[in-house]
Structure formats: C-alpha cells, structure tokens
Amino acid sequence: YFRDLPRADCSPAEALYILQGNYQGFTQYDIGKVFSSTILNLSLKKIIKIEEIPDGGKNDSKITILPQDTNSVSLNSDEIIILNFLITACKNKSKSIFGGSKESDNPNEITMKELKKYISNNSSKVVSLKSAIDKAIKSKLTSNRILDLKGIKRRNANMAGCSIGVF
C-alpha cells in the first residue's frame, strides 16, 4: 500500500527494502524485482521509453534512453545506478553480444533480449550493481532517519542469539 511507504519520492528499491524488513541487503531474487520495477519507474519518469517490437514472430521490448535536461527530473541514487547500468549495457551490447558493432546500432537503445544476454555475460557487473544498490539504499534510508543502523545491529545480534539457542 502506498500509505505504508515513508515518502512520496520513495524508489522501488527503497520500498522493497523497507517492506521486507530484511536489512542485510537484497537477495539474488530481490535484485531482479528491484531492477524490473526501477526500469518501469524510469519509464514513468520519462527517463527511458519502453516499446514492444516484433522479433521473428515473437514480441520483444526495446528500451530507449531519452535525452534529458539534467535539472528536469530528480532521481534517487539507486535509480541513477540502474540507469548507468542500462547506459553501459546499451553502449556495450554490440561488442559483448555480437562480436562487433553494427551500423544500425543505436548506443541509446537495447532490446530485452540483448539486455538479458548482456546480464548473463557480465555476472561480475551484476554483482557490483547489487552491491552498489544495497549500499545506496542503506545510506539513503539512514541519512533520512528511516533506518537506524544501531537498532539493526542489535536486532541482528538478538536474532543470531536466538538461532544459536534453538540449535
């Protein structure tokens, strides 16, 4: 529910982090949800455009990074991290996926098929992306006094003590 979120400008990653209550960072399953929902949020903010394109009888989606006035839209740090990942994927898709650039390649566009291939071929960049998002979210939420690191440490210590007592 929207009313459960702490702020109107809360990013999808912040919302998931708060609502899950697991302050150790995102799991590998969570990062896919965060990535997808942030892409949709960037589309709503008109930072990117998502459109369906035909792909040999199947439908694919194309993400286009739109030109921006640097002062027009405010993005959260985790949204900037994911946008930069998309920009890098767009620029490097032809080199890493097809072995060379094509003349028709637009450095501001990538299909979902190309993005999935880029992600699967660059697992270390995905690990770095997850780490950067975890750090950005924790920093933003603690600086806004939504999370208290001391309280989280106490909670984790109590949880560890409980699990040791159970075994």
Place the predicted regions along the sequence by residue:
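Juxtamembrane "helix exit" motif at the C-terminal ends of alpha-helical transmembrane segments
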Residues: V166-F167
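Short, amphipathic alpha-helical interface elements at domain boundaries
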Residues: Y1-A160
